[in-house]
Amino acid sequence: MSLLKVDNLMFNYSDKELFNGISFQLNQGEHAVLVGQNGSGKTTIFDLITKKLTPDKGTIEWTPGVTYSYLDQHYKVNDDFTVIEFLEQIYKNLFDKEKHMNELYEKGSNPDDPNYFKYLDQASLINDELLRDDFYSIKEKIDKVIVGLGIPKEYKERKLNILSSGQREKIYLAKMLLEEHDVLLLDEPTNYLDAPHVKWLAEYLQNYPKAFLVISHDEPFLSQIANVVLHLQ
């Protein structure tokens, strides 16, 4: 199934023709990389398909309902969050369910309450939902990703604003990986990674069950993760 279709895309930048009739599509499960010389417009393609820029001609169509995570090189967030607060935002609806479940268990702590069994039954149903959504492995999942990208687990309680720019970029990348949207759009994801963490990311993306489109100057990295190569002339 096609997730994204780009057809006959034309775009001029500062009176210079950048694209003249580019067409491609990204299908479900494809691991695609976008390659081309410096200045060929790879990042501009991302700005166009994420609607930061508008093409002069042509069409860009996302299949209705498809979601994507976009990691660009200028990602900004409220850096007053701690690392764990920032990453747990991804699962806010599940943590809200857990809070409600605990409130029900507290209400159901008195066997003499006429609603005792009602509270416990409702709490049990919520717990079943949390189990189905793998809620109880979230903290382990977060640890695996941040450590894989080179962030020690003890940094989870640190605020983003005291981390280095490279460490923040790793946390932003971790968020994209954990969100598990239909499509990952990654622009230079290895910029701040040491060799062992580039290796970890390559293995993670090799096994990624959904689609992605990646830009990188790291050719060995691209060759490890790609099953589709899109060339910008």
Task: Give the positions of each predicted feature.
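ABC ATP-binding cassette signature C-motif
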Residues: 1-233
